[in-house]
Design a protein with these regions (language model features):
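Ubiquitin system architectures
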Residues: 1-84
């Protein structure tokens, strides 16, 4: 199991968050974990918002499919995402 450290930028809060995730994590699962983390940090739970959100990779310059996993995209340590 490979653990990655990634950064997530949430423009809604103009803040970035560091996360540790497994390389085999699906994009859907990553987005779920991100919304929980951001909700806890900002005390603004994003329940029901997940289906409205998109995750983009800054390094790859593309929107990521929820059905794929980080490993499918070749995501590594230090990759940065935007949750919009």
């Amino acid at each position: 199991i490979t653990i990655l450290l990634v950064e997530v930028y949430a423009p809604a809060y103009d803040k970035s968050y560091d996360m540790r995730v497994e390389e085999q994590t699906s994009i859907r699962q990553l987005m779920e974990e991100m919304t929980v983390l951001i909700g806890q940090k900002e005390r603004n739970y994003m329940a029901g918002e997940l289906e409205k959100l998109c995750l983009c990779s800054i390094e790859r310059g593309e929107m990521l499919s929820r059905e794929q996993c980080l490993q499918d995209y070749g995501i590594g340590n230090g990759y940065r995402f935007v949750l919009i």
